[in-house]
């Protein structure tokens, strides 16, 4: 039983390796440059960099309403 399961496992490994061999690869330097350019282009829309206005912040402390 272990022989047939070993063959099946190896077939899965070969299939995965064939899939990975067919992928297009990008150099790390090119990927880093693209990521940096994307970050710089979209920095004005990033709430972690620009902050969130208090009127649109759903996590702001709620105001207490009290009736006299």
UniProtKB/Swiss-Prot annotation:
Residue positions where N-acetylserine is found in the record:
2
Function, as annotated: Guanine nucleotide-binding proteins (G proteins) are involved as a modulator or transducer in various transmembrane signaling systems. The beta and gamma chains are required for the GTPase activity, for replacement of GDP by GTP, and for G protein-effector interaction.
Q: Which gene encodes it?
A: GNG5
Alphabetical list of Pfam families matching this protein: G-gamma
Which residues form the lipid moiety-binding region (S-geranylgeranyl cysteine)? 65
The family database entries (InterPro entries) matched by this protein are listed as: G-protein_gamma-like_dom (IPR015898), GGL_sf (IPR036284), Gprotein-gamma (IPR001770)
What is the topology of this protein in the membrane according to its UniProt annotation? Lipid-anchor
What protein name applies here?
A: Guanine nucleotide-binding protein G(I)/G(S)/G(O) subunit gamma-5
Propeptide feature: residues: 66-68
Q: Name one GO molecular function term.
A: G-protein beta-subunit binding
Positions bearing Cysteine methyl ester:
65
Query: Any idea which UniProt keywords this protein has?
Result: Acetylation, Cell membrane, Lipoprotein, Membrane, Methylation, Phosphoprotein, Prenylation, Transducer
For this UniProt entry, what's an example GO CC term?
plasma membrane
Q: Where in the cell is it found?
A: Cell membrane
Q: Which organism is it from?
A: Homo sapiens (Human)
- GO biological process annotation, one example: G protein-coupled receptor signaling pathway
Subunit-structure text: G proteins are composed of 3 units, alpha, beta and gamma.
For this chain, the family text in UniProt reads: Belongs to the G protein gamma family.
What PANTHER family does this protein's entry cite? GUANINE NUCLEOTIDE-BINDING PROTEIN GAMMA SUBUNIT (PTHR13809)
List-wise, which residues carry Phosphoserine?
2
């Amino acid at each position: 039983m272990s022989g047939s399961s070993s063959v099946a496992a190896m077939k899965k490994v070969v299939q995965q390796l064939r899939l990975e061999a067919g992928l297009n690869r990008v150099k790390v330097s090119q990927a880093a440059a693209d990521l940096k350019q994307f970050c710089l282009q979209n920095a004005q829309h990033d709430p972690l960099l620009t902050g969130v206005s208090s009127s649109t912040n759903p996590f702001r402390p709620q105001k207490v309403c009290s009736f006299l």
